Amino acid sequence: MSKHELSLVEVTHYTDPEVLAIVKDFHVRGNFASLPEFAERTFVSAVPLAHLEKFENKEVLFRPGFSSVINISSSHNFSRERLPSGINFCDKNKLSIRTIEKLLVNAFSSPDPGSVRRPYPSGGALYPIEVFLCRLSENTENWQAGTNVYHYLPLSQALEPVATCNTQSLYRSLSGGDSERLGKPHFALVYCIIFEKALFKYRYRGYRMALMETGSMYQNAVLVADQIGLKNRVWAGYTDSYVAKTMNLDQRTVAPLIVQFFGDVNDDKCLQ
């Protein structure tokens, strides 16, 4: 047992079973089913498609008409604009496992080998969100044969083998069967919550903090991906139970929260 390893049995000992049951019940209300090969595309929005643009990229004023706003000079802005999310991914070019490792260690691990602080905040330093690496393309160099799903250990900076499912089945589950829109990404990260780890200290509040932590994590991955030349897209259009089963995850303990695809976006080459 490594010095960083935590037994879930210990965490479960301090978890209120009633809180756990209520949070799980609430969580599954957000589960989704997306299998386009069996049905039309599923839309959860009540807004007609023709009207959606009216609601996108807008601001809400809390006191409209009652007070004038104070403008801030755009000269203060020194950050770069976020690159657009990738679509129509293409795996024509080989991707080295070294590039993937570079993403993982810079997005989720400290540059100081002796530090336990990660690049994103976590309530109570509990870090209840786990990152799983899923290979989706055979066009990856130096990937160890036999395993296509790994669990990333950010303190050890190591990969734990989890599942041996083939890349086609894995991509079908993560994409919700909607691979035509996405194209051919090289790999994906799946962010999963360990319920007991999120709840044992802060109870219901811990669930909220875990969801916010997930956003910090994938935004960090966005920033690193931009720097190393990877395109990415955050994706929620998948069937939760199907993803968990394909990845060999015990849904009584852990659940996928969001998927993030990575790779090249390479014009028309993959459409030929």
Swiss-Prot record:
CDD domains referenced in this protein's UniProt entry, alphabetically: McbC_SagB-like_oxidoreductase
GO molecular function, one term: oxidoreductase activity
This protein's GO CC annotations: cytoplasm
Domain of life: Bacteria
Subcellular location: Cytoplasm
InterPro entries: Bacteriocin_Proc_Enz, Nitroreductase, Nitroreductase-like, SagB-type_dehydrogenase
Keywords attached to this entry: Antibiotic biosynthesis, Cytoplasm, Plasmid
Function in brief: Necessary to process the inactive microcin B17 (McbA) precursor into the active peptide.
Family: To R.leguminosarum TfxB which is involved in the processing of trifolitoxin.
Protein name: Microcin B17-processing protein McbC
Organism: Escherichia coli
